């Protein structure tokens, strides 16, 4: 398998953590991508092969062993989950629906964080304060919801985290990494305590975000 990726993308981090937790990371050939800082509002040169594999030209994109291009992090994680032999990050016993409900909120939180990042990269003259406030409000609501459902974040001993837990952890980590984002911890003690422990998982520590090369 081949993965187009960037170390800054929380969606890429989701795929990498899922692969590591499932023991599949060694089967993936990583293809780094570069993104000029105007990626959020302009068409930029794409890393060779990315747009050909995925016309959306979005990362992460995974080329499967069968040559199928999967250009969505959720779809990629579903594929990786299907390759696992005994443990899963997406339940197959009916538990996928409660997990999926929390996952959708955590994934929407990532979308709001990245949307803010793209808007922050726009020149001041065309940056929308209203759009930024909309994303901040969405982020706050999502973190509040995850705090209210913090009991669902607990990973039983000896088990793998599910995709909702992985994505919630990534959202917390992204909020910490971008210094223009507010601290998610005040007023959310359960989420704060959970993340303090979850962030120490090897797959989390090995995938801490860093800036993407511009060229």
Residue ranges of model-derived segments:
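GST-like domain detector, emphasizing the conserved glutathione-binding G-site
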Residues: 1-129
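Non-transmembrane alpha-helical segments in soluble domains
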Residues: 77, 81, 100-103, 143, ...
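A general structural signal marking secondary-structure boundaries and capping sites
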Residues: 84, 150-153, 202
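Short, hydrophobic secondary-structure boundary micro-motifs
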Residues: 87-92, 155-159, 184, 205-210
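GST-like fold's C-terminal all-alpha helical module
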Residues: 106-196
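Long hydrophobic alpha-helical segments typical of transmembrane helices together
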Residues: 183-215
């Amino acid at each position: 398998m081949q993965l187009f990726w960037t170390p800054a993308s929380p969606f890429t981090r989701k795929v990498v953590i899922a692969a590591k937790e499932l023991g599949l990371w060694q089967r993936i050939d990583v293809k780094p991508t570069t993104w000029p800082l105007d990626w959020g509002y302009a068409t930029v040169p794409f890393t060779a092969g990315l747009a050909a594999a995925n016309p959306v030209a979005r990362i992460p994109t995974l080329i499967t062993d069968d040559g199928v291009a999967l250009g969505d992090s959720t779809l990629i994680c579903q594929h990786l989950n299907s390759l696992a032999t005994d443990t899963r990050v997406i339940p197959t016993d009916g538990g996928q629906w409660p997990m999926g409900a929390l996952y959708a909120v955590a994934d929407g939180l990532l979308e709001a964080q990245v949307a803010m990042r793209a808007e922050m990269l726009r020149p001041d003259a065309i940056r929308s304060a209203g759009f930024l406030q909309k994303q901040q409000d969405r982020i706050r609501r999502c973190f509040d919801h995850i705090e209210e459902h913090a009991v669902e974040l607990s990973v039983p001993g000896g088990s793998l985290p599910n995709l909702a837990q992985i994505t919630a952890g990534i959202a917390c980590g992204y909020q910490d990494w971008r210094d223009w984002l507010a601290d998610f911890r005040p007023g959310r003690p359960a989420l704060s305590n959970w993340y303090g422990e979850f962030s120490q998982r090897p797959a989390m520590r090995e995938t801490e975000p860093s800036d993407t090369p511009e060229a």
